Amino acid sequence: AARRDELHDVKVRGNLCAGPVQIVECDPEQAHFLYHTWHCSAYERRLCDRGLCYFTPMIFRNLAWYYREFLTVNVAMASVAPMDRHGYFNLSAVTGVSRAILDRADIVILEVNEHLPRLRGGFDEVIHISDVDMVVEGAHAPFTDLPAHPATAEDTAIANLLLPHICDGATVQLGIGGMPTVLGKLLARSGLHDLGMHTELCSDA
């Protein structure tokens, strides 16, 4: 953002950014930067409403493939957990797509955040220091939780209609909002067993 007037036709892709995104805020005419997102945070939805963010619809499971097959990435920057003793950085909560983006990038920049959790699985959840061009380090504030949405009477009614359709051994995904929170509480008291959880996101539900 500080170099705005030196730069032109810079396209930036983000994903669930809490904001503010300085390159957007400093260039409301979009003469220098164009900002795109795959999944909108509340902040990015407000940017879309103002015409300052372009939403690209995408099924999450296809996103890594889409990067690997179709997109050019000049510079990629990702937040990571601190490097382990073997020289690997863990991609933490964005393991589903980060490795594909970093593999496509001409330049890889990592920002180390000491508060990010380490997630396990396969090998796409890490990147080795030898594959990194630059590392940014600094102090970070601890993460804060999103405030819970209070449930309405309608949320409670819908949750009560859904509960009888969930059986032992079912896999559920409970998103963000009043109704998923109510349904989660009903499930906890229901006596159902062996429930699985689809963990695209985890909420208090």
Stretches with model-predicted labels:
Residues 1-205:
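Conserved alpha/beta enzyme-core scaffold
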